[in-house]
A protein has these predicted regions:
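PLP-dependent amino-acid enzyme catalytic core
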Residues: 1-211
Length: 211
């Protein structure tokens, strides 16, 4: 890496080639693990025990959450009259940070999360008010294909997130196509699920100023 510190990033073997190559270009060693992000997490913990390297959780970490919370600050800085924010949810790091930042400054702003129907770990946890781990997940939105939400992120979502909804694979695909055709943007599945939730009227946002 830039500071000459060795880093190993564990990813599921189905991770997009672009993500793998971009990570390598920044100086990291990439370890591809068969399965999901949860399997990659388990491999990272195993490597930490073997090597003594420092383990950094991809989402259930206070500093990671704080860093992602700066997105919420930027949103409020650019759109101070905002009504709502819609955030993709996997393990919950991004939405935890964004929700904490926004609710700390503008508690009236709604913060909504969106998960894939095939990987609804945080959705189930919040709606059943009980931390949930899924046995299996299935979605092409690899960035949010998570069986186990973070324990810290679950607590933060319980306190600061107004609601989480799910979208189907077809709805996500339609959102990707809409972004490409209408906005000339190429989005991955994880980035398109908030748009899918808006397009298919999953949330009470009509007439609102929404990010």
């Amino acid at each position: 890496t830039r500071r000459g510190i060795k880093s190993i990033v564990c990813m599921p073997d189905g991770a997009p080639i672009m993500k793998v190559e971009n990570t390598k270009s920044l100086g990291a060693e990439v370890c591809l693990v068969p399965g999901t992000y949860d399997d990659a997490h388990d491999k990272a913990v195993e490597l930490q025990a073997e090597t003594g390297m420092t383990f950094i959780h991809p989402y259930d970490d206070e500093q990671v959450i704080a860093g992602q919370g700066t997105i919420g600050l930027e949103i409020l800085d650019q759109l101070p009259d905002l009504d709502a924010v819609i955030v993709p949810v996997g393990g919950g790091g991004l939405i935890s940070g964004v929700a904490f930042a926004i609710k700390s400054l503008r508690p009236e702003v709604k913060v909504y999360g969106v998960q894939a129907e095939g990987a609804p770990s945080m959705y189930r946890s919040l709606h059943e008010h009980k931390y949930q781990t899924l046995k299996n997940v299935a979605t092409f939105a690899d960035g949010i294909q998570v069986k186990t939400p973070g324990e810290l992120t679950y607590q933060l979502c319980e306190e600061y997130v107004d609601d989480i909804v799910t979208v189907s694979e077809d709805e996500t695909a339609a959102a990707i196509l809409s972004l490409m055709e209408n906005q000339k943007l190429v989005a991955e599945g994880a980035g398109a699920v908030p748009v899918a939730a808006a397009l298919f009227h999953k949330l009470p946002i009509e007439g609102k100023k929404v990010v």
